[in-house]
Amino acid sequence: MALYWCTDDIMETYNDEPYATEIPPADKKYLPMASGHSITTALGFLEVADVIVGHNIIGFDIPIIKKFYPWFTPSGLVVDTLLLSRLYHPNLLDIDKKHGLNHMPLQLYGRHSLESYGYRLGEYKGNFAKTTDWKKWSQEMQDYCVQDVVVTNKLCQHFHPYLNGSR
């Protein structure tokens, strides 16, 4: 089960494939603001998902979720694209230099961050995270979080051939 969007406080599945290669249809909307109920519902879906994918999900996201929701225990496979990046691209600086990514800031060369991958994959994340204290919801925050999902999905697609043995 791959969870990509929610409408009317109900998480919907877009694709039952663990490595979906499509972005949700444009007519599907993310909730403008999460309520405690929708967060608990979403975490319930994540607990029973066959696969959960995130960038630094093992080192950051899951520990933060457990801090606020101690009962949260994913039962499926957890795929961390940060770990995959470090495993399959240990020479990322050389790769970046070889490709000459003129649009990517030099300080991001060789980094395994989601921001760096946003540039590499043509899905720029934006500057919101650098300009906010994250204390109050805003549409900019929502858009930034949605873009995080888009970049992570594209990064997962990048690593899929490595994981299924076709690369």
For the regions a language model picked out, list residue spans one by one.
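A short, aliphatic-rich alpha-helical micro-motif
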Residues: L46-E47
